[in-house]
Amino acid sequence: MNSRRKFIKTGMLGMAAINLLPAINSFANQSAYNPGKPNAKFKLRFAIASDGHYAQPDTNSDLFYSDLIKWLNKDHHNNHLDMVIINGDLVHNRPDLLSKVKETYLDKLSVPYFTIPGNHDYADAAVWKGVFGYEDKYVVDKGDIGFVFANTADTKGGYVCPDYGFMNRSLDQFKNKKIVFVILHIAPHQWLIEEKAIFTDCPEIITLLHSYPNVKAAFHGHDHSLDGIRYTGKLPHLFDSHFGGNWGTEYKGYRIVEVTADNQIAT
């Protein structure tokens, strides 16, 4: 990925700006990504990946996971990562293998990691807590920065809107944060008519996200062919393609997000 598209979002004084670039094409071309400020000190630097689809038939999902862990640990060694997010579809219709994915691969990460279910994980709060120690919707507090994670699927793989009550309470809890990031496997908005079978239509969630000016971006997986950015109003929705599965972009990869001391956001 040699061409780097730039998207600039600026707002009121005191609001974070966001400089958005495509997701890292790390597996296809390790030289594709170059940090904007080498050796810079960041308030927070994290990686986000999705759609590993462990145990999908006719795929080498063990290789996909081992590659992801290798690349993330290398990135941490070279540039430092504060955390990693795996945004859904950790397994492919095999919730019984979530523990294996955790113990064999994710626990090998050199940094803390957080996960959220996707539609192929067939998981609810009880399943997720049994494996990862937290439920399928939760918040993470990183000082000036807050993360809101919510499940967007049921235990049969159906698509659902995020729990509105939880989202409302969580965003209100973080209303004094400088920056809030929202992590949802399935995007709660359909940009195109053809996406009725791909994303959910949750106008109340979109309105809620727009009502908090410190919500700076939403991150989604699910559509393996999307690596880039879409908007609802002025809110960026970022996609990171996939690191597993048998369809989507030709490359597999992940996204790096960097927040500077003055709350500039780059990815």
Task: Kindly label every feature range from the protein language model.
Residues K37-A47, V139-F149, K175-I179, Y231-P236:
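Beta-strand-turn-beta hairpins that frame and shape the catalytic cleft
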Residues Y33, P38-A40, A49, N60-D62, ...:
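Binuclear metal-dependent phosphoesterase catalytic core
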Residues A47-S66, H92-N93, Y122-F132, T155-V160, ...:
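Acidic/histidine-rich helix-loop elements
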Residues L21-S99:
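N-terminal active-site segment of His-dependent metallophosphoesterases
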Residues W71-M83, G157-H237, I265:
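His/acidic metal-ligating clusters that form di-metal
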Residues N87-L106, A123-G133, I193-E194, D227-G233:
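Metal-dependent catalytic neighborhoods of phosphoester/phosphodiester hydrolases
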Residues M1-P22:
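N-terminal secretory signal peptides and thylakoid transit peptides that target proteins
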Residues D51, G88-D89, G118, H185, ...:
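Active-site glycine-centered loops adjacent to acidic/histidine catalytic or metal-binding residues
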